[in-house]
Swiss-Prot record:
Probable amino-acid or metabolite transport protein. It comes from the Bacteria. It is a multi-pass membrane protein. It comes from Rhizobium meliloti (strain 1021) (Ensifer meliloti). This is Uncharacterized transporter R00093. Belongs to the amino acid-polyamine-organocation (APC) superfamily. Keywords: Cell membrane, Membrane, Transmembrane, Transmembrane helix, Transport. The chain crosses the membrane at residues 19-39, 50-70, 91-111, 140-160, 164-184, 201-221, 244-264, 288-308, 342-362, 363-383, 403-423.
Length: 465
C-alpha cells in the first residue's frame, strides 16, 4: 500500500457530501460526550470526594469552554475534514499535523472501545437484576461496534440523524431524573451531609487527582470540527453547533453531579460502573429505572457512533494527503463515505474493547485528547499572528484572546499532573508510542507527502512572509 510510484495527474476525486446542518453538528459533539455523564466522571469522586468531584466538573468545563471557543474560530475558517489535523497542516507544519491526526484517531477509537465495554457492562447489570448472572458481554460489544460501523458506512446524514434522536432522548432522561428527584419522586431523599462531614477525604491533592476523570464530562466536544467538509455552511453551523453543545454539556454535567452525589454515598459513587442508572435504581421508581437504562444505552451508542465518524474522517484526511497510505483515502461511489477508513479502524476498536480494562482505555483516550488540546494553544497563537483579524474572513471570532489560550494551557498542564498521579506508567508508555510514530513519519513516510498540495485554503500569505 506504499505510494512508491511517482505522482501522476489524477482525475477529480469523489468528495464527501455537504448535507449537515447545525443540529447535526450539535448531535455529533454532544452525542460523543454525553456518555461521560452516564459513566466515567464518577471516578473523580473516588479520587477526591464529593467537593473534589464538583470542582473537577467545573474546572474541566472551563477547559472545554476554551477548547470550544478556540476550535470554533479556526474550524469556521479551515473547513476541511480532519478538523484539528487540517488546522495543523495549514498553520504549523507536517510533523505536527501527523501527530495531531494520530491523537484524534486514538482518542476517538479508544473512546469507541470504552463505550462498547459500557454497553456490555450495562446489559450484564440488568441481567443480574433479573437473576441471570454471568452474562457473556463480548457478543454485545462486537454487535454494537459492527452495527454502528455499518451505519457509518452507509451515509453520514442517516448516521448523524440517528445520533440526533438518541442523543436528545439521553439528555432528556437526565433532565427527567433531575426534575423527578426535585419533586419528591425518589424513595431516598437527597443527602449532602458528606460535604460538611468529610469534604476533602484526600486533601487538596484529591482535587488535582480528580481532574483526570472530570475531563470525561466533556471529552470529545472538539469532534464537531470533523464534520467541517460535510456541513452545508461551515462558517455558521460549526460555531453554533459547538457552542450550543458545550452549554448543553455544562448543564447536564452539573445536574448529573447533583443527583448522583445526593442519592449515593461518595464511597460507592466513586467506583460505580453506571452511576446515573444506579441513581435511578436508588429512587425506587421503575419508570425512572427504565428511562435511565434507555438513556445510558442511547448515550453509549451515540458516543460510539460519533467516534467512528470522527476517527474515520481523521484517518481518511491523513491518507488523502499521503501522510498514511493513500488507499485509505477513498470515498465510496454510492454512499460518499470514507468507507475504507471506517472498515480499517473496526478491528482496532474491537481489540481494545475485548482485551483492555475500562480505566486503561479511558486513560488512553483522555491523554490523546489532552495532547490535542495542548496543540490548540500554540495553533491559536500562530493563527492569530500569521493571519490577524481582518486579513481573512472568519465565521466566528472568539473573545478575550489570548486569555482562553493561556487558561487552556495552564489547565492542560494541571491535567497532565493529575493523570501522572494515578497513571504515570500509562502516560510514559503513550508518550513513547507517539515519539516512535513521529520518527516513523519523519524517516519513512514524509517522502511520499506531496509538499505542494498541503496548503489548500484560499488565504493570502502569512503576515511577515
Amino acid at each position: 500500500m506504499d505510494d512508491t510510484t511517482s505522482a501522476a495527474p489524477e482525475p477529480d476525486r469523489l468528495r464527501l457530501l455537504r448535507v449537515l446542518g447545525p443540529a447535526h453538528v450539535w448531535a455529533l459533539g454532544v452525542g460523543i460526550v454525553l456518555v461521560g455523564e452516564y459513566m466515567g466522571w464518577n471516578f473523580s469522586v473516588g479520587k477526591g470526594g464529593m467537593i473534589a468531584g464538583l470542582m473537577a466538573c467545573w474546572v474541566a468545563g472551563l477547559l472545554y469552554t476554551c477548547v470550544a471557543m478556540i476550535d470554533s474560530e479556526v474550524t469556521s475558517t479551515v473547513a476541511a475534514a480532519g478538523g484539528q489535523y487540517a488546522q495543523a497542516k495549514h498553520i504549523v507544519g507536517p510533523l505536527m499535523a501527523f501527530n495531531v491526526g494520530l491523537f484524534l484517531v486514538m482518542a476517538y477509537t479508544m473512546l469507541e472501545a470504552a463505550n462498547a465495554i459500557t454497553v456490555g457492562f450495562l446489559l450484564d447489570t440488568v441481567a443480574g437484576m433479573q437473576g441471570q448472572t454471568g452474562l457473556n458481554q463480548q457478543p454485545f460489544i462486537v454487535l454494537a461496534i459492527m452495527f454502528l460501523a455499518w451505519l457509518n458506512y452507509r451515509g453520514v446524514l442517516a448516521t448523524l440523524t440517528f445520533n440526533l434522536v438518541i442523543t436528545a432522548i439521553a439528555f432528556l432522561a437526565i433532565v427527567a431524573l433531575f426534575v423527578s428527584v426535585q419533586f419528591g419522586a425518589s424513595a431516598v431523599p437527597l443527602d449532602f451531609s458528606a460535604i460538611t462531614s468529610d469534604p476533602l477525604p484526600y486533601g487538596w491533592v484529591g482535587i488535582v487527582a480528580s481532574l483526570h476523570f472530570g475531563l470525561w464530562y466533556y471529552l470529545g466536544i472538539e469532534g464537531t470540527c470533523q464534520a467541517a467538509e460535510e456541513v452545508r455552511s461551515p462558517a455558521r453551523s460549526l460555531p453554533y453547533g459547538t457552542m450550543a453543545g458545550i452549554m448543553t454539556l455544562l448543564i447536564a454535567a452539573t445536574m448529573t453531579w447533583y443527583i448522583c452525589s445526593g442519592l449515593m454515598p461518595w464511597e460507592y459513587l466513586g467506583q460505580a460502573g453506571t452511576p446515573l442508572f444506579d441513581a435511578a435504581r436508588v429512587t425506587g421508581s421503575t419508570g425512572l429505572m427504565v428511562l435511565l437504562f434507555v438513556g445510558t444505552a442511547f448515550a453509549t451508542l451515540a458516543s460510539a457512533n460519533g467516534c467512528i465518524n470522527d476517527a474515520s474522517r481523521a484517518w481518511f484526511s491523513m491518507s488523502r494527503d499521503r501522510y498514511l497510505p493513500s488507499w485509505f483515502g477513498a470515498v465510496h461511489p454510492v454512499y460518499r463515505t470514507p468507507y475504507r477508513a471506517i472498515v480499517f479502524l473496526v478491528p482496532i476498536a474491537l481489540i481494545f474493547a475485548l482485551g483492555a480494562p475500562l480505566d486503561q482505555v479511558v486513560t488512553f483516550s483522555i491523554l490523546s485528547g489532552l495532547l490535542g488540546y495542548t496543540f490548540m494553544t500554540f495553533n491559536m497563537v500562530m493563527f492569530r499572528n500569521k493571519w490577524p483579524l481582518g486579513r481573512i474572513k472568519r465565521g466566528y471570532v472568539h473573545p478575550f484572546h489570548p486569555l482562553p489560550t493561556v487558561v487552556l494551557l495552564i489547565l492542560c498542564s494541571t491535567a497532565y499532573f493529575a493523570v501522572f498521579l494515578g497513571y504515570g506508567t500509562q502516560l510514559s508508555a503513550m508518550m513513547c508510542f507517539y515519539i516512535v510514530a513521529s520518527l516513523w513519519f519523519h524517516f519513512r513516510r514524509y517522502k511520499f507527502v506531496r509538499r505542494g498540495d498541503q496548503f489548500t485554503m484560499p488565504w493570502p500569505k502569512p503576515h511577515g512572509y
